[in-house]
Amino acid sequence: MTTSATPMAAVDLLQQALNSNIIPNQEYLLQGSILDSAAEHLLHRLRGLCDNVDTGPEAFADYEMCLSLKVPNEKTPVMTVRVRKAQDTDAPYQLRYIGQPELGDRNRPTLVRSSLDIACTPHVVDFLTEMGFRVDFEYITKGYMFRKGRMKVTVSKIFKVNSSEPISQSYLVELSVLAPTGQDVIADDMRIFAEQLKPLVQLEKIDYKRFAQMP
């Protein structure tokens, strides 16, 4: 006769999985942008390079909300999380935690940061609000997704909620991989793939701290 695992047993199993490096908890990321006038050329290039050649890219439309937990009289949030929901499918809500980029080796070709994605119920926003989280901003992302092995490429536009007009005349291009800790060889694979997209788009590590220091 089988019995359900106790909470402590579940925690132990999770810790064992983390120690065994089988949980994809690190995101390797490169980002860039491309003007509307050149986007079709990039999509054509990606169709030829990526795995879903026959079926074409996967279109998506996601609603995303950023919430933060702050301490009174402190400017820096204690924690920031994101809640995402695909608008055109019955997929569950996604709760996502994104950590600060690792300093690490400056010669590393990609940005690396902790990332955890959890499927959850539609009540997740109410739950976070009860915990003290507050909404910082929200937006809609619409675009196309390609796959190349473990790599994911998205070409998307950002819209304000309840607006049909994009916030800019360019597309955001992201190349990312979710992987367990310590698989830095992925970064080299991403660099090689990004080179194949030049000169249409320049994918690079983005220094978010530099943006935060801008007046």
UniProtKB/Swiss-Prot annotation:
Q: Which Pfam families match?
A: Med18
InterPro entries the UniProt entry points to: Mediator_Med18
Main localization of the protein described in the UniProt heading: nucleus
Query: Which top-level group of life is the source organism from?
Result: Eukaryota
Which GO MF terms are attached to this record?
transcription coregulator activity
One GO BP annotation is:
termination of RNA polymerase II transcription
Q: Which GO terms describe its cellular component?
A: core mediator complex; mediator complex
Q: How does it assemble?
A: Component of the Mediator complex.
The family line of this record is: Belongs to the Mediator complex subunit 18 family.
Name it: Mediator of RNA polymerase II transcription subunit 18
Upper classification of the organism = Eukaryota, Metazoa, Ecdysozoa, Arthropoda, Hexapoda
Which gene specifies this protein's sequence? MED18
